[in-house]
Amino acid sequence: MTIIRKSHPLMKLINHAFIDLPAPSNISGWWNFGSLLGVCLIIQISTGLFLSMHYTSDTLTAFSSVSHICRDVNYGWLIRYMHANGASLFFICLYFHIGRGIYYGSYLYKETWNIGIILLLMGMATGFMGYVLPWGQMSFWGATVITNLLSAIPYIGSEMVEWIWGGFSVDKATLTRFFAFHFILPFIIAEMAMVHLLFLHETGSNNPLGIMSDSDKIPFHSYYSLKDLLRVVALLAFYLTIGFFFPDALGDPDNNTSANPLNTPPHIKLEWYSLLAYAILRSIPNKLGXVIXLVFSILVLALFPLLHTSNQRGXMFRPISQTLFWLLISDLIILTWIGGQPVEPPFIIIGQLASIFYFSNILILLPVAGLIENKLLKW
């Protein structure tokens, strides 16, 4: 078996990536979320494939087809709720994964980090289009509001919106193309994840101390493969608990009503994992300014390698940066909460202050903290 593992062209690739891969001996559970994301992606592709066999991307029958899946298809309700809650689970793991990268300075592997940002954008686009497919009330109005933001682009905005809609409003053509893109994007994400892994294995994994670990490596299997397996079991237990006992906890009640273009909901809300960017969008009264802030709220992650001023890689031994990091996490939780609230006082001013702090923390406070910590170390 060992000879085949190390000589067969296909097995050799798997061996180098998952078996004999040299890994730092001190990486913690925070390095586990990459493999959990892989598990989530496999679950999403598998359940999505079965759902697509029964779903119809037509405005007249989309809502009924989702109802049919839940009522008439064997275990259709389970597949539907696994897919819906699997998206939330995917983003929970994704945000933990990004948070670990920021805290421990993994963003200094620039190629791996930038591909990760592309994966985040593709994941958010896939999640948004999936949110539209059940053709509930919030699906329709969410699609209308978000796609209409492109009209803020000078000169070509209005034409772009009509081009995406396939007409003069969100209708059958929009739903059909959203279904097509929602089906193909997870496979592209899987391909990009392989490229992400390829670049990661060029440099090797970072570790909590942020130091070179070439002299102290251990094989990935069986040390970390079993460690990952334990957390996969824990993830699946949590996943099935949500799916069986609280299937609608992370959804919107308005989506249990079929889409009605003549009845606008009092408050248009996206899925929880998009709410922090949505809150930043709403905090700026100008339409173009808000769209710029929305895009920049994600792309600002690409500036982390350029704004790294500390002589140390991670924030393990940097108390000022640690404090700012946890303030940033608190700020993101506040933005997520604000994104789910109506646009009225006091939520408007809270959202604006949280948005200002988000950008100022990343662009000003964290780099300044790194410089201060460098000075303190020389005393």
From Swiss-Prot:
Entry superkingdom: Eukaryota
Membrane-spanning parts: 33-53, 77-98, 113-133, 178-198, 226-246, 288-308, 320-340, 347-367
One Pfam family here: Cytochrom_B_C
Residue sites binding heme b b566 per the record: H97, H196
GO biological process: mitochondrial electron transport, ubiquinol to cytochrome c
Subcellular location: Mitochondrion inner membrane
Cofactor(s) needed: heme b
Co-factor binding comment: Binds 2 heme b groups non-covalently.
Keyword Cell cycle applies: no
Main location (coarse class): mitochondrion
Disulphide linkage map: none
Cited CDD domains: cytochrome_b_C, Cytochrome_b_N
Keyword terms of this UniProt record: Electron transport, Heme, Iron, Membrane, Metal-binding, Mitochondrion, Mitochondrion inner membrane, Respiratory chain, Transmembrane, Transmembrane helix, Transport, Ubiquinone
GO molecular function terms listed in the Swiss-Prot or TrEMBL record: metal ion binding; ubiquinol-cytochrome-c reductase activity
Bilayer topology: Multi-pass membrane protein
Binding site for a ubiquinone: H201
GO cellular component terms given for this protein: mitochondrial inner membrane; respiratory chain complex III
Binding residue positions for heme b b562: H83, H182
Family: Belongs to the cytochrome b family.
Subunit-level organization: The cytochrome bc1 complex contains 11 subunits: 3 respiratory subunits (MT-CYB, CYC1 and UQCRFS1), 2 core proteins (UQCRC1 and UQCRC2) and 6 low-molecular weight proteins (UQCRH/QCR6, UQCRB/QCR7, UQCRQ/QCR8, UQCR10/QCR9, UQCR11/QCR10 and a cleavage product of UQCRFS1). This cytochrome bc1 complex then forms a dimer.
Main function: Component of the ubiquinol-cytochrome c reductase complex (complex III or cytochrome b-c1 complex) that is part of the mitochondrial respiratory chain. The b-c1 complex mediates electron transfer from ubiquinol to cytochrome c. Contributes to the generation of a proton gradient across the mitochondrial membrane that is then used for ATP synthesis.
Note: Heme 1 (or BL or b562) is low-potential and absorbs at about 562 nm, and heme 2 (or BH or b566) is high-potential and absorbs at about 566 nm.
Stated name of the protein: Cytochrome b
Species: Perognathus flavescens
